[in-house]
Every structure is written in structure tokens, then in C-alpha cells.
Amino acid sequence: MFDWFDYHGHMCISFELLGLSTFDFLKDNNYLPYPIHQVRHMAYQVCQAVKFLHDNKLTHTDLKPENILFVNSDYELSYNLEKKRDERSVKSTAIRVVDFGSATFDHEHHSTIVSTRHYRAPEVILELGWSQPCDVWSIGCIIFEYYVGFTLFQTHDNREHLAMMERILGPIPSRMIRKTR
């Protein structure tokens, strides 16, 4: 953080100039998954950043690849003979978590719906209330996307979203279902 200031009741924070988002890099690379060693390093940094937030009683609530930026998105280009195309490999996987516009302190009002749909935890979809674990769910979805190159839960419908979760993870716990009634 370089500086911060208040602008008509809005806290503004200035940071260093960053590179592309991890999503934009993935998209520009034809959704070619990141190599596992890069996934591991990016996942570690995201977990460390979120741990810092949670230790300070703050939930990000909108973690997604678009809100994770490379410090520098320079890349090396190589030609894949098998796929007959150029592929990019980011030179440095140093990242920063950004966009704290919907971040919420533990003691503040928690709106019913948070997170971008594809990274939304089941307790948010079921409107059971949420806290810091919703960030952890989002991290899991992000790591999957980095590793395979596509979104785990590609949907825009609550019921379909929950059905997709059940297909992958098994039935939603009955204690959660009971609380929705």
C-alpha cells in the first residue's frame, strides 16, 4: 500500500501498478491451465492474503480470478507442436488480492447475497448467513479453475448450482437443509 485517503466517506487505497488479473491471463492464453507449480504458488499467496484479512476480522466476500492480479504479467512464449499454437507462461506468479469494495468486518451488517455466482458458497445460496468460510469456499473454486482452465460451477441458477455441488461433493448436509425451512 502506497497511501490511503478518505473521499467523501469512502476509504481509498493506492497500490503499486499491477499486471493482468489471473483470469485475463488465463483467457488470453486460450484457457490453458496454469502448471501445478504455478497453481501451488498462487494458491499459497491467496491463502496468506485471506488469512491476514480473517485474522483482522474481515471477510473479502468477492474472491475470484478477476480480483487476483499478477504483480507483473510478463510472460514467455513457446510453441506447442502438439496443439500447433503459441502458449504463454507467466514469468512470475507473484500476485495481489484486490477489490475490497464488498469486504465486510465481522461486526458489520452482512448482506444476504455475497460473492460472484461461480465462487459462491452453499450457505450463501441457501441464505443461511455467512462468515469467513465463504472466502475459503471461493479459494477452492479458484484453485480448481487455475488447475483445469475452466470454472467449476458454470451456472446462473441457484437450484442448478446446488445440484452441481451435490454431484461433485455429495448431498448437502441435512442440518443445512433443515435451516432453510
Regions inferred by a protein language model and the residue ranges of each:
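Intrinsically disordered, low-complexity regulatory segments of kinases
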Residues: 1-181
